[in-house]
Amino acid sequence: MGGRKWQSIKRQKARVDAQKGKTTTQLSRAIIVAARQGIPDPAGNFQLRTAIEKARAAGVPNDSIDRAIAKGAGTYEDGESNYEEMRYEGYGPGGVAVLIEALTDNRNRTAADLRAAFSKKGGNLGETGCVSWMFSQKGVIRLVGELEEEKLLEALLEGEGESYEWLDEEDGGGVEVFSAVNQLENLNQVLQNHGFTIAETELRWLPENTIEIAEPDQAKALMQMIDTLESLDDVQSVTSNFELTEELLALAG
């Protein structure tokens, strides 16, 4: 399944996660929205359960998690719970496509912050639909621990998984399995039933094709722009369609 295409995404993601990781604010907002959109009980709300697992893995205190669930359920009102999911699109230096998912309680503030982050590095925030056609959304589950390929294939067949890819240790190790968005919860349950250890479950935008970046200055500007975008509390995820060599990735850092 197009190894280099996926490797590029994982390298960029690993770098950003290692540098910053998601803040408590970002993770709590994801819990609030998940609890509001479904029932505020993780046992019956897959999106909420996944958001809570991510928060716990990042060390978010239990009281913060409980408070976020209560905010989403409407039992803890503080005037800060009215978040909506937004998707923004734009272009980085050299015309690279950038897709951003955000949770915001103020669209104007978020758009202004994003516009500033883009323009500072020679990019620009675009109109809705300008680059989203270049990406597809997939369910992604990362498995760790003992992994037998034959058993994995059986589970993927049963759970309607689409593909899988082994990860290098520098990318966290294990294997990532991919599914259609509407099959993610089912595949997650099937993998659990087969005894696999699940490290992470998420929806992820993946580029259909990538742009090779060969200029060090452009690579540095792109990585700095993505770092700035990721650092905004309103931002939940940033996906792009550029690809760097390992040498350029090191220079960009």
From Swiss-Prot:
One cellular component term from this protein's GO annotations in UniProt: cytosol
Keyword vocabulary terms for this entry: Cytoplasm, DNA-binding, Transcription, Transcription regulation
SUPFAM superfamilies, alphabetized: YebC-like
Top-level taxon in the UniProt lineage: Bacteria
Location of the region described as Disordered in the Swiss-Prot/TrEMBL record: 1-22
Gene3D superfamilies the UniProt entry points to: 1.10.10.200, 3.30.70.980
GO molecular function, one term: DNA binding
Gene Ontology BP annotations: regulation of DNA-templated transcription
Primary location group: cytoplasm
Coiled-coil region(s): none
Subcellular location field: Cytoplasm
Family per record: Belongs to the TACO1 family.
NCBIfam families noted in UniProt: PRK00110.1 (NF001030), PRK12378.1 (NF009044), YebC/PmpR family DNA-binding transcriptional regulator (TIGR01033)
PANTHER family: TRANSCRIPTIONAL REGULATORY PROTEIN YEBC-RELATED, TRANSLATIONAL ACTIVATOR OF CYTOCHROME C OXIDASE 1
Protein name: Probable transcriptional regulatory protein slr0989
Organism: Synechocystis sp. (strain ATCC 27184 / PCC 6803 / Kazusa)
